[in-house]
């Protein structure tokens, strides 16, 4: 969800939604295993309540990474990137009105959050090839985050919307 408040962009993603997205990706992976060996692996690839502490740790790491990228590129994250009331919240101080870039930023934050959970899960379940794949996806999304943040800042500066 994207909201605009007092010259700020606030991007919010529910942890439940992010976990659901990660769970969907895991279920797709479990289906490919069924196709290979005929056994049902759905139970092996389910985020359980007992996994929630690991999920929160993974999401804290994602928040730290997002904050660092935004600080380096735009030097303007007001209330940082945090987990607040079961939501991931990214607050950016100054922005421009280019909704395409803001929407892209929102999508990337969601992607990074889901991929962070998947990466943590792959490491925990000892699937190094999957962990490596998720690490590559994570890195690609971080690069995307950086380029969109830079573009958002460029357009803002050229349109004099930072003032």
Sequence positions of predicted segments:
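Short, hydrophobic/amphipathic alpha-helical patches that form generic packing surfaces
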Residues: 111-123
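Structural motif
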Residues: 101-111
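Short conserved catalytic/interaction loops centered on acidic-Pro-aromatic/His motifs
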Residues: 126-136
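Conserved short "hinge" loops at termini or chain/domain junctions
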Residues: 1-98, 102, 140, 144-163
């Amino acid at each position: 969800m994207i909201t605009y408040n007092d010259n700020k962009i606030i991007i919010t993603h529910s942890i439940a939604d992010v976990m659901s997205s990660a769970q969907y990706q895991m279920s797709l992976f479990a289906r490919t295993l069924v196709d290979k060996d005929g056994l049902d692996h759905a139970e092996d690839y389910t985020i359980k309540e007992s996994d929630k502490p690991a999920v929160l740790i993974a999401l804290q790491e994602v928040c730290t990474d997002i904050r660092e990228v935004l600080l380096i590129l735009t030097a303007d994250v007001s209330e940082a990137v945090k987990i607040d009331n079961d939501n991931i919240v990214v607050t950016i101080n100054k922005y421009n009105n280019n909704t395409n870039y803001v929407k892209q930023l929102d999508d990337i934050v969601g992607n990074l959050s889901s991929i962070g959970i998947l990466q943590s899960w792959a490491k925990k379940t000892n699937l190094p090839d999957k962990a490596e794949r998720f690490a590559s996806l994570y890195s690609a999304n971080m690069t995307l985050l950086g380029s969109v943040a830079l573009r958002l800042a460029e357009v803002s500066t050229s349109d004099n919307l930072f003032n």
